[in-house]
């Protein structure tokens, strides 16, 4: 077998696998959105416990039974407000 016919058979063989793997043969006019939400399983019988380990009671106003606020750190943002400015490298080279 010469190289041209071998290459042609190889391409035909690969095309058969790619044709079956692709979804082009069953393409639709509309696009369906895929849900990418991950849900966490939880026992329904268990008592709801807050972040402090205390059991919560039903509240009449404000947040609901299964809601709580998370604490926010006070102070400047450490990524944007540095305590010291960045240092520049020392250059001991003296021009003549």
From Swiss-Prot:
Region called Disordered, residue ranges: 68-96
Coiled coil ranges: none
Keyword set, alphabetical order: Developmental protein, Differentiation, Glycoprotein, Hydroxylation, Secreted, Signal
Tissues in which the UniProt entry reports expression: First detected in heart stage embryos in a patch of cells between the developing cotyledons. In vegetative and inflorescence meristems, expressed in a small cone of cells at the meristem apex.
Source domain of life: Eukaryota
Subcellular location(s) of the protein: Secreted, Extracellular space
Signal sequence residues: 1-21
UniProt record, GO biological process: cell surface receptor signaling pathway; cell-cell signaling involved in cell fate commitment; innate immune response; maintenance of meristem identity; meristem development; regulation of meristem structural organization
Residue positions with a glycan: 76
InterPro entries cross-referenced by the UniProt entry: CLV3/ESR (IPR044962)
GO cellular component: apoplast
Disulphide-bonded residues: none
Record-listed Hydroxyproline modification sites: 73, 76
Molecular function (Gene Ontology), one example: receptor serine/threonine kinase binding
Chain's role: Extracellular signal that regulates meristem maintenance. Acts with CLV1 as a ligand-receptor pair in a signal transduction pathway coordinating growth between adjacent meristematic regions and controlling the balance between meristem cell proliferation and differentiation.
Note: His-81 seems to be essential for the activity of MCLV3.
Subunit structure: Interacts with the extracellular leucine-rich repeat region of CLV1. Interacts with CLV2. CLV3-derived CLE peptides interacts with a tetrameric complex made of two CLV2/CRN heterodimers.
Family: Belongs to the CLV3/ESR signal peptide family.
UniProt name for this protein: Protein CLAVATA 3
Record organism: Arabidopsis thaliana (Mouse-ear cress)
Upper classification of the organism: Eukaryota, Viridiplantae, Streptophyta, Embryophyta, Tracheophyta
Gene that produces this protein: CLV3
């Amino acid at each position: 077998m010469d190289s041209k016919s071998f290459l042609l058979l190889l391409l035909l063989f690969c095309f058969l696998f790619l044709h079956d793997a692709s979804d082009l043969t069953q393409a639709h006019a509309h696009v369906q959105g895929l849900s990418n939400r991950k849900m966490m399983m939880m026992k329904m019988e268990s008592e709801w416990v807050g972040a402090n380990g205390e059991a919560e009671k039903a509240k009449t106003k404000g947040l609901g039974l299964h809601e709580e606020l998370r604490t926010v750190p006070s102070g400047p943002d450490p990524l944007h407000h540095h305590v010291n400015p960045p240092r520049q490298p020392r250059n001991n080279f003296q021009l003549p």
